[in-house]
Amino acid sequence: MPIFPKPKVTVILANLGTPDVPTASAVRAFLKQFLSDQRVIEIPKLLWKIILYSFVLPFRPKRVAHAYASVWGQDSPMREILFAQTDALKRQLISHYPQLDLNIVPAMTYGNPGVQHILKDLAASPQEHVILLPLFPQYSATSTAPLYDAFANWIPKQRHLPGLTIIKDYYRHPVFIQALVSSVQRFQQQHGKPQKLLMSFHGIPQPYADKGDPYADRCRETARLVAKQLGLTPDDWAISFQSRFGKQEWVKPYTDELLTTWAANGIKSVQILSPAFSADCLETLEELEIQNAELFLEAGGTSYQYIPALNTSVEHLELLRQLLQAHLDALNYSLAYSAH
């Protein structure tokens, strides 16, 4: 009777991306890749190319590099956290499936380790199954869909194709909501409660939402469920959207404008939670924690506190484990045990 090798299964844990180092040249390379994706910028290609190369890439990288440098440790926060999340899931999951040749790898849509390089490695070592877990709790064509595109471009070039599972999102998963609630409760036990809790999500252009991108609605549902579980009244909290880019209208309300309005209207203390980010990064550590704090305090507020992203919290790792284990259990049965 032939002895079959263990079925190879790879889990790809994917986040958006980051420059290699906080320098203008590295940021330029990153922005060039990121902003050249038509999922991100839906402007006619030739027109956008002129804008990108004439007005964005010559000037923006230096300013953005300075912002990255202000939050950079030994590496980019996003990459450090992604690697730590991956290592933790390896410890939790690989020994649980001895019948599978299971690997868990980190990937970035833009920058390194790039998802294209991960897929190239998989082609060199054909897999029975690949599970892609984008670390975007709320699906958007601007964030999650480019990972679908990477697979769509890779598949026609392969002869030995794996089974493929993509976990689209988890914006209302009860373990996700509880993880956010626990992070707020833990923070407030130490720092007290503010007048307002603001749940700030990365924004998208309003025309994208008008064309059917479900992201903003999913953000609102995440925020509603968190507020409900915290027992907040409508006066206790609000939702907003940050990080707008360019001159077109984005989904509203805008985080910076809401904060200054609150301060002008006598709101003195605010805490910020950003449930769109699975790892702290430039948009949370620099934009939310530094820039928006300055805006609020200069407008008359007296207390502004940022509640960290879920990062490698026990509750977050439990969420990721559960998201993956449901699929791994099925694969373990269908791939490993059917071979015996």
Curated annotation (Swiss-Prot):
It catalyses: heme b + 2 H(+) = protoporphyrin IX + Fe(2+). It is an enzyme of class 4 (lyase). Pathway: Porphyrin-containing compound metabolism; protoheme biosynthesis; protoheme from protoporphyrin-IX: step 1/1. Its EC number is 4.98.1.1. Keywords: Cytoplasm, Heme biosynthesis, Iron, Lyase, Metal-binding, Porphyrin biosynthesis. It is found in: Cytoplasm. The keyword Transmembrane helix does not apply. GO terms for cellular component: cytoplasm. It holds the Pfam family Ferrochelatase. It comes from the Bacteria. Its main location: cytoplasm. PROSITE patterns: FERROCHELATASE (PS00534). Belongs to the ferrochelatase family. HAMAP family: Ferrochelatase. This is Ferrochelatase. It comes from Acinetobacter baylyi (strain ATCC 33305 / BD413 / ADP1). The gene is hemH.
